[in-house]
Amino acid sequence: MLDTVEHAATTPDQPQPYGELGLKDDEYRRIRQILGRRPTDTELAMYSVMWSEHCSYKSSKVHLRYFGETTSDEMRAAMLAGIGENAGVVDIGDGWAVTFKVESHNHPSYVEPYQGAATGVGGIVRDIMAMGARPVAVMDQLRFGAADAPDTRRVLDGVVRGIGGYGNSLGLPNIGGETVFDPCYAGNPLVNALCVGVLRQEDLHLAFASGAGNKIILFGARTGLDGIGGVSVLASDTFDAEGSRKKLPSVQVGDPFMEKVLIECCLELYAGGLVIGIQDLGGAGLSCATSELASAGDGGMTIQLDSVPLRAKEMTPAEVLCSESQERMCAVVSPKNVDAFLAVCRKWEVLATVIGEVTDGDRLQITWHGETVVDVPPRTVAHEGPVYQRPVARPDTQDALNADRSAKLSRPVTGDELRATLLALLGSPHLCSRAFITEQYDRYVRGNTVLAEHADGGMLRIDESTGRGIAVSTDASGRYTLLDPYAGAQLALAEAYRNVAVTGATPVAVTNCLNFGSPEDPGVMWQFTQAVRGLADGCADLGIPVTGGNVSFYNQTGSAAILPTPVVGVLGVIDDVRRRIPTGLGAEPGETLMLLGDTRDEFDGSVWAQVTADHLGGLPPVVDLAREKLLAAVLSSASRDGLVSAAHDLSEGGLAQAIVESALAGETGCRIVLPEGADPFVLLFSESAGRVLVAVPRTEESRFRGMCEARGLPAVRIGVVDQGSDAVEVQGLFAVSLAELRATSEAVLPRYFG
């Protein structure tokens, strides 16, 4: 029997499985209070997915407000759309705008790695499409268990194939990212996908439904049983110790070729002025799209749910509403434009159906074969869910963790020991070449990729006539964030900011994806709140806004949470991509190598401590955001004036790793001469922040050095590029051939996963 609104009103005591749907007792009572009756089965399903942690941000919302509190009017000046929209949009000049966002698809990617990762890419691409933009590139932040753990092969293989298969089929270049291995991610990988889109400012579209009588059109793929309770339930629950799910919702199934057609269809609809408001269908499906569109508009909405094209027989209204079938969009269209809208969809062979209209009321009403199964105030579904002030407590173990310094570890001293250390780090899964993974992605499709391979940040040309471009980088360090969540988030921000700066671009905006354990753990909530405040304060110090983001909680197996992993993405703008700064050495004969910034004895949380002693303790490197701003300004000026021919930021593995990566990228040797009195181990392997390796043309050395001195930026000459050499030599200590470095680095991942 169909559970209608009328039936629900006359059967107040009918038992309902709200607990099985993830609702708490008090949440169920609140729904009854809102409606003045018990919810129908369909309403109950709708509230359960929309009030899930993934969709409602009920544990994080109270803390995320701090981003708004710390964003000044000056920081907002370039933002065309920010937090609360499908994706942030930034004015980059000359009438152009860029939209970008990063989101998680962690839990589905463990259950079914290929489809979980593929649909993660598809979902973030549709968020970008919904802003009126053409998607132009993707990036990914991946975290897996230990490289030698049995299940890591299954998960990594599926995730990498899923990302490559979907992104390559869409014709979107994958311009960068990061892959990290750590035992804490066994059973709970992180798959964070970022997409960048480009649009003219006048083409910006937002998610709202207004104008009584305007039609609601669902277009794209048919609606099936895949993904019901998928990301919205999976992302709001943990895995048990055996790695199996406590709940068994299905993972969504993606069709990249349908999405590719959908992109072109949307762009033609936008160009024709046929769209008033638009929303993609992601987590919670039509439940989310209809309630968000209605609550953001100036009226109500009616939906004839039985009009939705299905690909499975005998689906219930709740299943149709909550299905997370992919490649679907929902648009608000003026009645006079419906025929033209449908004609464009027919041209692209995209199925489109009028399923409802905007009303002048204040309710979201959904019917099924003429009977009302949903009658709710839409804001209570989409925006007025529960908000929790979870208990926050600094873990009792934090003091002991911070007291466990790496200074107690044995350090290499001799040239042979330093050489062995370099090869050990380079030959570990933590610092080895990622070519085995990245070669499965198309980095140069569409022909606008300027930097991707070997680069700190990816760069794209946006305007062929002027050369205007953008650079993007994403970074995170769970190890540093465990030691100090506030500083760890700022270090991730600083590195992403620096990675954009070393390309010659100017950082302008931030997005984030905050991956943490259970919010019901006060220690996790302490990590989360500290990371949010660190990131927000850091953005305020740098003067760049957070335009949006995502929170992923319940990333744990049993009671063991992942390392707190705030992923930070930074967008930069460059006036002309022809003045970009590459990573590889050897562009100019006899380049001088210089180290910018201060090097301190900072090894707590470092890759050296991890690889050589499996040690994690102490305090992370010092963060100096004023220095990061200064570095960015110097690099931008140097790029404009042609003073720098290559640059590479220093992070994991320190100076030694940066030198090796730049030498291999340029396929040229170099000779390093350490400053007199320097500790070779500290200078080569410290992970102090705020540092950059630059190659300066011989003719520009004095000019560049003078600019650094004038601005108060430490700059030390540490060697020269030797195009006649096939080795990296640290004078007086050791030398390693490029062939040995490359072989050591490139052999690691194929050994584990080939």
UniProtKB/Swiss-Prot annotation:
Q: Name one Pfam family in it.
A: AIRS
Q: Which Gene3D superfamilies match?
A: PurM-like C-terminal domain, PurM-like, N-terminal domain
Pathway assigned to this chain's UniProt record: Purine metabolism; IMP biosynthesis via de novo pathway; 5-amino-1-(5-phospho-D-ribosyl)imidazole from N(2)-formyl-N(1)-(5-phospho-D-ribosyl)glycinamide: step 1/2
Name the Gene Ontology biological process terms.
Answer: 'de novo' IMP biosynthetic process
Primary place of residence?
cytoplasm
SUPFAM superfamilies according to UniProt? PurM C-terminal domain-like (SSF56042), PurM N-terminal domain-like (SSF55326)
What reaction does this enzyme carry out catalytically? N(2)-formyl-N(1)-(5-phospho-beta-D-ribosyl)glycinamide + L-glutamine + ATP + H2O = 2-formamido-N(1)-(5-O-phospho-beta-D-ribosyl)acetamidine + L-glutamate + ADP + phosphate + H(+)
Q: Annotated region Disordered: where?
A: 1-21
Please provide one cellular component term from the Gene Ontology annotations of this protein: cytoplasm
Listed binding positions for Mg(2+) 2 are: D127, D280
Q: How does it assemble?
A: Monomer. Part of the FGAM synthase complex composed of 1 PurL, 1 PurQ and 2 PurS subunits.
Task: Provide the family line.
Answer: Belongs to the FGAMS family.
Protein's name according to its UniProt entry: Phosphoribosylformylglycinamidine synthase subunit PurL
Organism in which the protein naturally occurs = Mycobacterium bovis (strain ATCC BAA-935 / AF2122/97)
For this protein's source organism, the top of the classification is: Bacteria, Bacillati, Actinomycetota, Actinomycetes, Mycobacteriales
